[in-house]
């Protein structure tokens, strides 16, 4: 299992923009304008699959299935 890295919103943006530079699993705490959301990025294959979650448990479960 890959280790999940906690990153800032700016770091997450860079990972999504240049996915082949940062292979791995990432989690970021961000705001969608009204709520705080967890942004999870499965970049284990360099494809930067991204999902938003309102629960840490759900975000971790999604990343750990990678």
Predicted regions located by residue number:
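A short, charged, amphipathic alpha-helix used as a generic interaction element across diverse proteins
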Residues: 10-16, 54-66
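Negatively charged, low-complexity tracts enriched in Asp/Glu with abundant Ser/Thr
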Residues: 1-22
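Short aromatic-glycine-(Arg/Gly/Cys) micro-motifs in beta-strand/loop hairpins
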Residues: 23-47, 65
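Short amphipathic beta-strand/extended segments with alternating polar/hydrophobic composition
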Residues: 39, 50-56
């Amino acid at each position: 299992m890959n280790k999940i890295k906690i990153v800032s919103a700016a770091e997450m943006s860079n990972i999504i923009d240049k996915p082949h530079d940062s292979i791995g699993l990432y989690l970021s705490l961000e705001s969608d304008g009204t709520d705080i959301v967890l942004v999870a990025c499965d970049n284990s294959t360099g494809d930067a699959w991204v999902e938003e979650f309102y629960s840490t448990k759900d975000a971790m479960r999604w990343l750990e299935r990678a």
